[in-house]
């Protein structure tokens, strides 16, 4: 009876070790990758919030997740800008609103799909360029309002995510 219990215990330990090992390595990959970005804690938080992160085994996979995060984060300011433009209550800022809306549309519809494709085909420099461009156009959007846009918080978050994405791509 003792022999059976010992074998059962050993089998349980081996199976548990195998099941836990990938999780530890995923956490290590995420932590190591995010530690080389300008916002490590936010990077870890964004990536771990994505259910697919547990299946990612390499840095390009983390880059794809961050590009998807950028699309999601860019959607809120785009929606706000669209509503503000439609309301037409502030004719003095219509040009800036339209320019910012076009920038966010570019990020969502062009830059991030291209960045994701760049990671998939092994061209991380292109992904880095798209991320840096996204950060730049968001900064220009905010500056066009002298730092007091109706979407300052959203611009800051989008800029942060774009910088994280650029830093991840640069590691490749």
Regions found by a protein language model. Give the residues of each.
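Folded extracytoplasmic luminal domains of secretory or organellar precursors
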Residues: 24-172
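Terminal membrane/secretory targeting segments in land-plant proteins
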Residues: 1-27
């Amino acid at each position: 009876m003792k022999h059976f219990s010992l074998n059962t215990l050993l089998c349980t330990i081996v199976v548990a070790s195998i099941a836990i090992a990938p999780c530890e390595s995923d956490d290590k990959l995420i932590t190591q990758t995010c530690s080389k970005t300008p916002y490590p804690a936010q990077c870890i938080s964004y990536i771990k919030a994505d259910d697919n992160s547990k299946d990612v085994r390499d840095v390009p996979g983390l880059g794809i997740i961050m590009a998807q995060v950028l699309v999601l984060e860019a959607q809120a300011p785009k929606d706000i800008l669209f509503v503000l433009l439609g309301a037409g209550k502030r004719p003095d800022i219509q040009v800036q609103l339209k320019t910012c809306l076009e920038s966010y549309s570019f990020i969502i519809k062009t830059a991030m799909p291209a960045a994701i494709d760049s990671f998939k085909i092994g061209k991380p420099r292109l992904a880095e360029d798209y991320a840096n461009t996204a950060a730049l156009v968001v900064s220009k959007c905010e500056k066009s309002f002298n730092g007091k846009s109706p979407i300052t918080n959203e611009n800051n978050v989008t800029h942060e995510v774009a910088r994280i994405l650029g830093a991840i791509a640069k590691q490749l």
